[in-house]
């Protein structure tokens, strides 16, 4: 299955045709797809109307610098801010993180979007792409926040996606633009980077997004298309039974798998349920690549939200217990 990117704030005729394809699981939205709160709700409705089956609509609405929807949405703090607060006031920090998850999920669902790929559970150890997107550099603190965030997302009716497995935070390179390799053995990763993923899986996380990072002491290829990482470690040793997403196959670190078709097949063959094709110019070739493949369409049903909440429904359901932890940490809408 593929999650595809579309070009703008409205669907083109070609994009409507793509949504008819059996292999299209849904759409990933970006800043380029956002004009306003009402517009993104209309786009979400148009995507669903164009598809002959239920589809998944996703976004990265983490907070901080990775927040695709801004105008009319709450300005969400980066996750690192909660980790910084934790040393002085752990219970308050966890309460604020739960409120962050509930607010984000509620606003995203009110726009007709099913899920934000969240939370980031990488360790915050200097990676150029992760930065303040991570809760902390301490595995146990990240694990504690991961449990709280997953539970809060579920309470708001949104599936939780742990990213980026098995841990992107320790390498320096940004895999959007460069190849990345982590030389540590599996035992070192299990003692540190995998700790938050174990916590998230135990908390009932619904999905995991893979990292385009190579761990040569574990497997020769990037984790995103490594059967050892996905089938043997994540599913076999760690017992994960949810959906496995690739990261975007347009990123530089995925190019080692070859051309577009090679990248799609490599990720699916390794055990990814869904491949992210975020660049519209890669969609047609990706669809051609999966023609004739057997597709796991049932895997995504549990990720689709409990129906579009709508902004009226969100506001009607908001009470003081929900907004109290938010005002100090988030302030006003962006």
From Swiss-Prot:
Enzyme class: hydrolase
PROSITE patterns reported in the protein's UniProt record: GLYCOSYL_HYDROL_F3
GO molecular function: beta-N-acetylhexosaminidase activity
Swiss-Prot/TrEMBL site (Important for catalytic activity) positions: 174
Major localization listed first in the record, in broad terms: cytoplasm
UniProt keyword terms in alphabetical order: Cell cycle, Cell division, Cell shape, Cell wall biogenesis/degradation, Cytoplasm, Glycosidase, Hydrolase, Peptidoglycan synthesis
Entry EC no(s): 3.2.1.52
Residues the record marks as active site: 176 (proton donor/acceptor), 247 (nucleophile)
InterPro entries named in the record: Beta_hexosaminidase_bac, Glyco_hydro_3_AS, Glyco_hydro_3_N, Glyco_hydro_3_N_sf, Glycoside_hydrolase_SF, NagZ_Beta-hexosaminidase
GO CC annotations, alphabetized: cytoplasm
Pfam families assigned: Glyco_hydro_3
Top-level taxon in the UniProt lineage: Bacteria
Pathway where this protein functions: Cell wall biogenesis; peptidoglycan recycling
Subcellular compartments: Cytoplasm
GO biological process, one term: peptidoglycan biosynthetic process
Binding site for substrate: 60, 68, 133, 163-164
Catalysed reactions, as listed in the record: Hydrolysis of terminal non-reducing N-acetyl-D-hexosamine residues in N-acetyl-beta-D-hexosaminides
Function: Plays a role in peptidoglycan recycling by cleaving the terminal beta-1,4-linked N-acetylglucosamine (GlcNAc) from peptide-linked peptidoglycan fragments, giving rise to free GlcNAc, anhydro-N-acetylmuramic acid and anhydro-N-acetylmuramic acid-linked peptides.
HAMAP family, sorted: NagZ
Protein family: Belongs to the glycosyl hydrolase 3 family. NagZ subfamily.
Name of this protein: Beta-hexosaminidase
Source organism phylogeny: Bacteria, Pseudomonadati, Pseudomonadota, Gammaproteobacteria, Lysobacterales
Gene name linked to the record: nagZ
